[in-house]
């Protein structure tokens, strides 16, 4: 019986083994998770280098933060370095194996050269003998010749970027400032990597695996990847649920490092947030605790892999953060001796995961995203929004929501301030004269994200028009939406609607006062003045009424001058922001928060309202009999209240130019009447211009037949004889210039780089001459106390040649001089060096097989002591495991 069972088991095992043997393993794209950290090596200007290990082989892994590259505007330099190393297959250039990336970092996996850099060796030696310096310069010259023949300019050549191999040969590295000219504007492809041999017969040393080739041709992303579809994200995350749970248990945060008490409540928050956000991997989670104020949870995605690893990025610091490839795994923590969360805390936190999963099970990803999003239209939040917000409160304890912060702008004038935010964010009511229906253009843009910042004003305005939704019965609609929103959103929405209604009633009353002299039989539906003008004037009218004429006494406006403000117009678009005269007041108020909106908006718009006349009066002029009376009456009242100012403004005729706001769009269409005026029609108009300070406060085309001018002058006297033209360019400052920045180390910069001229491969030969002088003397030729003095020495070519016993040989001095030639066209290159007497004994064809004067003798394969001399000389303290 047992034997039979055993035989059956064996036969079944053979069947399973045969099936497994027939399966073809699917190769996985390379991932940074496959590498383990051994120790840090060095730190440069654009990243840190770590000693990594994979499959028993050591690699040098350069880690570059994407955020730093974005802040320094050098994202293209990281791409250039990757491409330059990927294209290079030379024995004198560091070999690049992988190019990987995650959500936060870019990883360049290169060969590890145990001999350190030449700068460290130079600090130990003091200076090199002529024979040693010639060999090093010869190998670097071959590397430069190879790069230049393949369209690559290094532009950062210095001893720090020359590494020493195990045999003592030189290899160039750090192509962060390199310039690649492939005569095309696309990224490198597979053919570029496979067909770039370093010699006539490519050796096996330069062959790459398919995974390496795939990683080297992948595109680098420097922005957070957008959220994927529900189906795709579900498929990706379903394969990593167990990995995600392990990751959440092994997280290292400042709280755990500081040995603070971790309560079950905080663990519940952590796990509930991680569990909830898995429905949308691209959605950031903010403020899990006060200690993780700036932490964000993102998807760590390899550049060439579709695998996604969930992680929580803690507050990075030199003493707490650890690279661990952004996944603070428990295995790495045990190896490095780091403090991890205790298992009893993990058990407590895992118990709460099922409860939180039940709460989030019925939620839709779209609903939860809309609930947490700071920029959305609250009218589209479904009925489950209240539950989502309740869950959000669990994830964000102690964090004031964005709606509450908007309401706390001014504790005294909540309604007024909120209304101003609403009106200046394009929430406007537009009346259609044909059917009398009202449209509401809703754009709740209280806070901007990167997409809003990058978008142009024209795109925003077009989007405003597309987002218009009908509100035929405002009260019923608002009541219907109240039942579908949370209490906080309802308060904001009700406040906005009620204020809009009160503002509209105010505007309607004031409009009746302005239009009292217009034809009595004209119906409101046929009124040529769009209702948007009334809404725009509500702010000014409210300022005048609520401040009890506080500022009227100090200004030159009379009581009747408010009528002019009712018909204020904008030069191009009256239904969208950007051209309104109130824009300047809003900008000033944002710069000076202590000053109330009433003060800034009212004080800056007094003169504007005085001289503003609606162009719509051109189509509906006053009756012939009432015209003169209205003009005389208004003119006399204006003169009575502000005679001195008007005399100053109108004594001399001024040519005016119609300006537009910087945020206004030029070619976008609009349905309001004033926007239909063409630019050529401005020639026939009288334009009034008033300046206050350094910018025009009001520039509005005056009405053809009626002009507010002193009664001593006739309208014919203010006609302009000069054609009015818009400026040809409104850009402030100098136009952007490509490669305007001076990048590199000051001592090794060529004169053409300092002068901002066009440069080519000759800049590398100049730097090679500086390195030759430094190898022979131990000090760069143009070294000085400050960078400015170094630049002056370079431009003057001030070289302090050694004298006496330290004097250089004539051949060495001449070689330095031909390399350090100011005229880049006459500067020496590889041909001149090969023919120079200093390099007469160099076997250029078999240079990589020659015995080098210095061969490193490390203690073991992980010895990094040869890099310490440079770090100590530059006072670089490489912390344990901080990025």
UniProtKB/Swiss-Prot annotation:
Family membership noted in the UniProt record: Belongs to the protein kinase superfamily. AGC Ser/Thr protein kinase family.
Ranges where the Protein kinase domain occurs: 35-839
Pfam families: Pkinase
Protein modification: Phosphorylation at Thr-745 by CDK1 during M phase activates its kinase activity. Maximum phosphorylation occurs in prometaphase.
GO molecular function terms noted in the UniProt entry: ATP binding; protein phosphatase 2A binding; protein serine kinase activity; protein serine/threonine kinase activity
Chain positions found as Phosphoserine: 295, 373, 456, 555, 559, 634, 661, 672, 729, 879, 882
Reaction(s) catalysed by this chain's protein: L-seryl-[protein] + ATP = O-phospho-L-seryl-[protein] + ADP + H(+); L-threonyl-[protein] + ATP = O-phospho-L-threonyl-[protein] + ADP + H(+)
Any one cellular-component term (Gene Ontology): cleavage furrow
Residues given in the record as ATP binding sites: 41-49, 62
Role played: Serine/threonine kinase that plays a key role in M phase by acting as a regulator of mitosis entry and maintenance. Acts by promoting the inactivation of protein phosphatase 2A (PP2A) during M phase: does not directly inhibit PP2A but acts by mediating phosphorylation and subsequent activation of ARPP19 and ENSA at 'Ser-62' and 'Ser-67', respectively. ARPP19 and ENSA are phosphatase inhibitors that specifically inhibit the PPP2R2D (PR55-delta) subunit of PP2A. Inactivation of PP2A during M phase is essential to keep cyclin-B1-CDK1 activity high.
Modified residues (N-acetylmethionine): 1
Gene Ontology BP terms: cell division; DNA damage response; G2/M transition of mitotic cell cycle; intracellular signal transduction; mitotic cell cycle
Modified residues (Phosphothreonine): 209, 224, 523, 726, 745
EC numbers on record: 2.7.11.1
Subcellular localization, as worded in the UniProt entry: Cytoplasm, Cytoskeleton, Microtubule organizing center, Centrosome; Nucleus
Main location: cytoplasm
Protein's recorded name: Serine/threonine-protein kinase greatwall
Domain AGC-kinase C-terminal: 840-883
Active site per the UniProt annotation: 156 (proton acceptor)
Gene3D superfamilies tied to this protein: Phosphorylase Kinase, domain 1, Transferase(Phosphotransferase) domain 1
Keywords assigned by UniProt, alphabetized: Acetylation, ATP-binding, Cell cycle, Cell division, Cytoplasm, Cytoskeleton, Kinase, Mitosis, Nucleotide-binding, Nucleus, Phosphoprotein, Serine/threonine-protein kinase, Transferase
């Amino acid at each position: 019986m047992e034997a039979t069972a055993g035989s059956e088991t064996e036969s079944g095992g053979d069947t399973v083994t045969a099936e497994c043997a027939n399966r073809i393993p699917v190769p996985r794209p390379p991932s940074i998770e496959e590498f383990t950290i051994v120790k840090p090596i060095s730190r440069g200007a654009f990243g840190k280098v770590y000693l990594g290990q994979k499959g028993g082989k050591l690699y040098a892994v350069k880690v570059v933060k994407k955020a730093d590259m974005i802040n320094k505007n050098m994202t293209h330099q990281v791409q250039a370095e990757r491409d330059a190393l990927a294209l290079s297959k030379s024995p004198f250039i560091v070999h690049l194996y992988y190019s990987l990336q995650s959500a936060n970092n870019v990883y360049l996996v290169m060969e590890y050269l145990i001999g350190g850099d030449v700068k460290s060796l130079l600090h130990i030696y003091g200076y090199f003998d002529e024979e040693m310096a010639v060999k090093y310069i010869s190998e670097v010259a071959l590397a430069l010749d190879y790069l230049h023949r393949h369209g690559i300019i290094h532009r950062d050549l210095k001893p720090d970027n020359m590494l020493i191999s195990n045999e003592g040969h030189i290899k160039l590295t750090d192509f962060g400032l390199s310039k690649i000219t492939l005569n095309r504007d696309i990224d490198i492809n597979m053919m570029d990597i496979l067909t770039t041999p370093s010699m006539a017969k490519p050796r096996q040393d330069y062959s790459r695996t398919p995974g390496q080739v795939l990683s080297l041709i992948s595109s680098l992303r420097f922005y957070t990847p957008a959220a994927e579809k529900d189906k795709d994200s579900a498929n990706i995350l379903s394969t990593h649920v167990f990995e995600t749970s392990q990751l959440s248990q092994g997280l290292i945060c400042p709280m755990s490092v500081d040995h603070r008490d971790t309560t079950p409540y905080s663990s519940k928050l952590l796990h509930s947030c991680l569990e909830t956000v898995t429905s949308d991997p691209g959605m950031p989670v903010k403020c899990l605790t006060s200690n993780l104020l700036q932490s964000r949870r993102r998807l760590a995605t390899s550049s060439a892999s579709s695998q996604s690893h969930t992680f929580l990025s803690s507050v990075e610091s030199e003493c707490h953060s650890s690279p661990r490839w952004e996944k603070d795994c428990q295995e790495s923590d045990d190896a490095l001796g780091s403090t991890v969360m205790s298992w009893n805390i993990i058990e407590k936190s895992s118990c709460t995961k099922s409860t939180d999963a039940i709460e989030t099970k019925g939620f839709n990803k779209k609903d939860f995203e809309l609930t947490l999003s700071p920029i959305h239209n609250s009218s589209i939040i479904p009925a489950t929004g209240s539950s989502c917000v309740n869950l959000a409160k669990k994830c964000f304890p102690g964090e004031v929501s964005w709606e509450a912060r908007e309401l706390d702008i001014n504790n005294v004038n909540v309604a007024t301030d909120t209304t101003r935010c609403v009106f200046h964010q394009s929430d406007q009511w537009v009346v259609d004269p044909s059917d009398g229906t009202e449209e509401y253009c809703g754009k709740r843009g209280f806070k901007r994200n990167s997409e809003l910042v990058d978008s142009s004003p024209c795109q925003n305005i077009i989007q405003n028009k597309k987002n218009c939704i009908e509100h035929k019965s405002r009260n019923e609609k608002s009541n219907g939406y109240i039942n579908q929103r949370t209490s906080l959103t309802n308060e904001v929405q009700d406040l906005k609607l009620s204020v809009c209604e009160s503002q509209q009633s105010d505007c309607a009353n004031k409009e009746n006062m302005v239009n009292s002299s217009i034809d009595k039989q004209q119906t409101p539906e046929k009124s040529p003045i769009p209702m948007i003008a009334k809404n725009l004037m509500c702010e000014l009218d409210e300022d005048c009424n609520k401040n009890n004429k506080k500022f009227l006494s100090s200004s030159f406006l009379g009581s009747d001058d408010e009528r002019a403000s009712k018909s204020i117009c904008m030069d191009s678009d009256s239904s969208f922001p950007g051209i309104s005269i109130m824009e300047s007041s809003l900008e000033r108020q944002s710069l000076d928060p202590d000053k109330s909106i009433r003060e800034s908006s009212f004080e800056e718009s007094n003169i504007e309202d005085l001289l503003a006349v609606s162009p719509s009066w051109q189509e509906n002029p006053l009756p012939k009999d009432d015209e003169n009376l209205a003009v005389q009456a208004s003119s006399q009242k204006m003169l009575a209240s502000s005679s001195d100012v008007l005399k100053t403004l109108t004594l001399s005729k001024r040519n005016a130019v119609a300006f537009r706001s910087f945020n206004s769009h030029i070619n976008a269409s609009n349905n309001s009447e004033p926007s239909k005026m063409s630019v050529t029609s401005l020639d026939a108009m009288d334009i009034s211009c008033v300046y206050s300070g350094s910018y025009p406060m009001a520039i509005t085309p005056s009405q053809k037949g009626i002009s507010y001018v002193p009664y001593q002058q006739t309208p014919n006297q203010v006609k302009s004889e000069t054609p009015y033209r818009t400026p040809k360019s409104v850009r402030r400052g100098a136009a952007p210039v490509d490669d305007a920045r001076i990048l590199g180390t000051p001592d090794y910069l060529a004169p053409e780089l300092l002068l901002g001229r066009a440069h080519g491969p000759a800049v590398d030969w100049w730097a090679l001459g500086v390195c030759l002088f430094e190898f022979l003397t131990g000090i760069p030729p143009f070294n000085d106390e400050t960078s400015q003095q170094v630049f002056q020495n370079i431009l003057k070519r001030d070289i302090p040649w050694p004298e006496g016993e330290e004097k250089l040989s004539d051949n060495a001095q001449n070689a330095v001089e031909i390399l350090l030639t100011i005229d880049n066209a006459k500067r020496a290159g590889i041909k001149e060096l090969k023919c120079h007497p200093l390099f007469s004994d160099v076997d250029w064809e078999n240079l990589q097989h020659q015995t080098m004067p210095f061969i490193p003798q490390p203690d073991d394969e992980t010895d990094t002591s040869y890099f310490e001399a440079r770090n100590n000389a530059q006072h670089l303290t490489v912390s344990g495991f901080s990025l």
